[in-house]
């Protein structure tokens, strides 16, 4: 049983259970607090930003990304690099790549433009999926990268609900 099969099994058996949680203490909580949760005597500290997805949603997002890759000719033997911050979207993208049979090339978010270019060249990556925070670094070497590698900005994946 592969790791992809484990995701499929969990999505089938526990579709509504929480699979992934993202907590960012630097972002304010957007959830409304009800009167019963509100502390009348003493104010509590702000809750950190929290986002979660269920096993069913996790599987759905991975499938959508896998389908997008497959429709664009990415499959077995191809290499897809991921340049994202540590976020809840990272794993569905990772599993989506694995579902196509392609290889995942995770890149460290601390890499400079030249290091990104070097790693993509060394890995012979066919696609680079990157977050908005990396636009500047990717643009700095886009001329060299785009000759061999298709660039895919994460914000473009919003239409796929990924």
Predicted features along the sequence, with ranges:
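Residue-level preference for short coil/turn positions at secondary-structure junctions
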Residues: 14-16, 76, 121-124
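A short N-terminal helical cap/helix-turn-helix that marks the beginning
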Residues: 1-21, 41
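Structural core segment of the AMP-binding/adenylate-forming
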Residues: 71-72, 99-162
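Solvent-exposed, charged/polar functional surfaces in cytosolic regulatory/catalytic domains
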Residues: 9, 13, 64-68, 144
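Aromatic/hydrophobic pocket-lining residues that form π-stacking "cages" and hydrophobic walls in ligand
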Residues: 7, 93, 138
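Residue-level recognition of oxygen-bearing side chains
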Residues: 2, 64, 89, 124, ...
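Conserved AMP-binding/adenylate-forming core of the ANL superfamily
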Residues: 20-87, 91-94, 112-117
């Amino acid at each position: 049983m592969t790791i992809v099969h484990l995701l499929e099994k969990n999505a089938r058996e526990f579709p509504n259970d929480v699979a992934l949680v993202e907590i960012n203490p630097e972002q304010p909580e957007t959830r409304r607090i009800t009167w019963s949760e509100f502390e009348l005597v003493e104010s509590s500290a702000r809750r950190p930003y929290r986002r979660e997805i269920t096993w069913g949603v996790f599987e759905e997002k991975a499938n959508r990304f896998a389908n997008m890759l497959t429709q664009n000719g990415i499959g077995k033997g191809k290499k897809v690099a991921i340049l994202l911050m540590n976020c809840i979207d990272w794993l569905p993208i990772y599993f989506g790549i694995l579902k196509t049979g392609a290889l995942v090339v995770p890149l460290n978010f601390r890499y400079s433009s030249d290091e990104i270019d070097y790693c993509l060249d060394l890995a012979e990556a066919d696609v680079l999926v990157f977050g908005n925070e990396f636009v500047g670094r990717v643009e700095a070497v886009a001329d060299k990268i785009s000759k061999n590698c298709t660039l895919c900005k994460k914000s473009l994946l919003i239409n796929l609900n990924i």
